[in-house]
Amino acid sequence: MATEINMPMGPGPLGEAGSLKIDTGSNMEVSIPSPVSAAPGELNETPSPSTPANPNSASRRPPRKSTLTQQQKNQKRQRATQDQLTTLEQEFAKNPTPTATVRDRIAEEINMTERSVQIWFQNRRAKIKLMAKKSLETGEDIDSIPESMRTYLAMQAMESGKGFPGAFLGRGMMPYGHGNMLMAGEQGGPSKVVIHHLTCRSLSIGKWTRVGQNTMDLIVFYSPDKCTMTYYINNEQAGYKIEYHFSCIKSICVENADDPTKVGGIVIELNRPPSFFMDQSPTSNGFFQCGDFTEDQQASQCLVHHLGGNPKVLSGQLAKLVSLESFMNRHNTMAYHPDPMAHGGMPVSAPVSPTNRPSSQPNFAQPHVGLFQESQWGISPAHHVMRGPGHKRQRSRSVPIAVDFSMLQTPMPSFYIQHPGEAQPQPHSPNIYAPVPQQPHALSPAGPGLRIDTQAGFGLDMRQYPMSATTAPSPSEYNSPSFFSQAPENTPLPASNFNTPYSSTFLSPMMNATNLNVPQSVSPISFSGGDPAIVDQSPPMSMLGRSASADIYHGGDSSAISDDGHSLNDMYSKHAITLPMHPPHSPAFVEPSQAELDMNQLVQFDTVDPSSLSPESVHQGIGGQ
């Protein structure tokens, strides 16, 4: 089967499409239309099926924009001239991502098509990205990257969540006024500088307003590591920056626009004017500090900045900013700073605690602003510093915390509040870790001369299990300090008639046990005597209640851990025990004249002969039968 292809050597008549005639030998012809060569003068006119025949209607709709490149228009390969390249380089230095309107203006100036200008910018951005990637490995060609392109690369790195080398950012990203301006050209190597973007479309300071037409016209970002907020503004052939430290921020909040005519966004109030910088690339090498470039110097007089944008988007971005530790401690002059040259060019050591404390003691957390700060343990509010980055040290649970008991030897209120304005650090005592050993002794007689023993009495241990080796049931070698005035320690404990356990109301099987007689506590602690000096500014201890249930265990049982299975530690080893105490004048107290009820009166047991329980007596009874 033969196939013949007939191709005409020239195009058909104008308006008639040429064809390829294929003879397949099976009486079937296939006609394929061939492209029509347009006249050279008709390159800019792209035929459209929707073009109306009426010329009046054609004037209403603008003609479709040409997508031809300069080579397609001239039908030959052509390179850009030196003047065209110079103009393109200058425009790229100002803004690497121009809009279609800007590209049309550039194309008219240099006599190129808009499509050719767009392709040149795309190729230039790709070349700069490749150059920046190689510069990370070799450290070369960093100075050849324009400042605007560095900001563009930083924005892309921020949006992707990756770090960006600080060497690309030059002096523009470094905080001024902290000694870093002199170190801008002395960076040993590229370091990661992470910036976060605030999606803002406008900036208003007083009567001066800037509105971003594209991505590079207005960029608002902050650096958590440098603790700076920056507004980058691109105008014509120069870039401008307004920058200030976190410590300059007095207040910051999100404003929702209730009025449709107003724009919502972030409102920032400063406590001092910001710093101003400008960059006239490529004539200058990076940003340099300048005066206030706003209209009538509004930014130096008005300290309220309004960043317009979507409140929903900005609220999430602002929440991330205010949660930063560097932002929360922005007004702390002794805050941790990662740069050793940040404070006057002098090296700063790590924060040192004003008191000598063991390594197992935890760091003192900074109290809430609304609370009074106590300085009775030797910690002054002026010494509260921000913890540096790293692992927070935790106190060992098996080692008791060190407390300066020497301050407690003198009478003092139990609720001692020191106002921040009167904070005075207490002198450190060398005896804080060397208490005087004392021998165990019995409780002193009831009265103001009570001395508290650290050993758990009455066989009741309020501590939770498991316990460490430091809580073994051994006699306490180091007793508590003298909270109250002491009495002779050799005075014996007065005899007491302790009640039987089943006469207590909390163990009674009666349904209405509150009507029973609740015997008064015979504890050696006195609730009717004079209050000791340590609670002279506190509620009187006689108002605290004490029930006879607290005396269920006799004073002779002094073991910290019970050996038998009947103590409350075995019954409620996993729960905290709270025993109520009721004084005679408490509403829960019942008069002694009411009826008494003993457990023996409720349950009667027959008399059992002990000899009848012997196996021998049972065996004899069976044998007798």
UniProtKB/Swiss-Prot annotation:
Disulfide bonds: none annotated. Coiled coil: none annotated. The keyword Aminoacyl-tRNA synthetase does not apply. It is found in: Nucleus. Keywords: DNA-binding, Homeobox, Nucleus, Transcription, Transcription regulation. Residues 467-496 have a biased composition (Polar residues). CDD domains: homeodomain. Residues 46-59 have a biased composition (Low complexity). Its main location: nucleus. Residues 1-83, 466-496 are annotated as: Disordered. Disruption phenotype: Leads to increased expression of the pyriculol/pyriculariol biosynthesis cluster highly reducing polyketide synthase PKS19. GO terms for molecular function: DNA-binding transcription factor activity, RNA polymerase II-specific; RNA polymerase II cis-regulatory region sequence-specific DNA binding. It comes from the Eukaryota. GO terms for biological process: cell differentiation. GO terms for cellular component: nucleus. Transmembrane segments: none annotated. Residues 73-132 bind DNA. Transcriptional regulator; part of the gene cluster that mediates the biosynthesis of pyriculol and pyriculariol, two heptaketides that induce lesion formation upon application on rice leaves but are dispensable for pathogenicity. With TRF1, negatively regulates the expression of the gene cluster and the subsequent pyriculol and pyriculariol production. This is Pyriculol/pyriculariol biosynthesis cluster transcription factor 1.
